[in-house]
A protein has these predicted regions:
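A short beta-strand micro-motif
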Residues: 3-10
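A short, exposed loop/beta-hairpin motif centered on an aromatic-Gly-Thr core
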Residues: 11-24, 45
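Short, mixed-charge low-complexity intrinsically disordered segments
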Residues: 14, 30-51
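Short amphipathic alpha-helices within nucleic acid-binding modules
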Residues: 25-29
């Protein structure tokens, strides 16, 4: 299973980070969420991808 952490700016994809380990993906999700905490234009989400 692969995991993508996607950063959206103004509801458009800005960057993608791909991980094969769920813990690494969650850590990156948390790190980016803290980084963009005060910016309302940015959102971060975790998506599970097949394969």
């Amino acid at each position: 299973m692969k995991y993508k952490v996607i950063v959206y700016y103004d509801n458009m994809p800005d960057s993608e980070h791909i991980f094969s380990n769920k813990n690494d993906a969650i850590n990156e999700l948390h790190r980016l969420s803290v980084k963009y905490r005060n910016s309302r234009m940015y959102t971060v989400e975790l998506v599970e991808c097949g394969g």
